[in-house]
Amino acid sequence: RDPEMSRGLGDVYKRQGGGHHITRPGYDIARLEKCIEAAKEEWKVDIYLEPGEAWALNAGFFLTTVLDVLQNGDTRLAILDGSAACHMPDVLEMPYRPPLLGADEPGENAVTIRLGGPTCLSGDVIGDYKFRQLPKYGDFLMFGDMAIYTTCKNNTFNGMPLPDIWLRRADSTMQQLTDFGYGDFKGRLGSKINPELFMSI
């Protein structure tokens, strides 16, 4: 261990980030362990793997409802009560296309539909998906792999409600953990401010 590196800093360590999908089927854990051991030996440091998205990989579902179906030129559109901008920001930031249960199955009569959110953001688009039947008003659509960023990076842009969180137990029973409402949106904007203050400006 280089005393110049650790002087005044205590132990020297290396944080390796959270991008490794160590829970993914087929991930070469043995190779990762060898790489870590080799790095520890060569640089005399402790290495920590951030408990990142691997711990929730492919976990969590996001249930949405179709609000409207329309046609724009050659593009079929379905507007959902779920928003890429508010509820799945990684869709826009990475970009990322979440899996959708029952969609993209092979079939001769599959129709392609662009799914989007109801906010005023023109880019509030989740993605294009293939369906055997055209979704209609009131249909439920369920996205998978939603536990990673939907819970920690969601927002209430345009007053969009946050999704309630439910726990599905091993015996298939359900328990509601959260119940978000307008009060949560209002509270983030300063609900304690006296409205008369704005009238006097």
Residue ranges and their predicted role:
Residues 33-42:
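Alpha-helix-loop-beta-strand connector modules within alpha/beta enzyme cores
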Residues 11, 43-45:
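Short, well-ordered coil/turn segments that N-cap beta-strands
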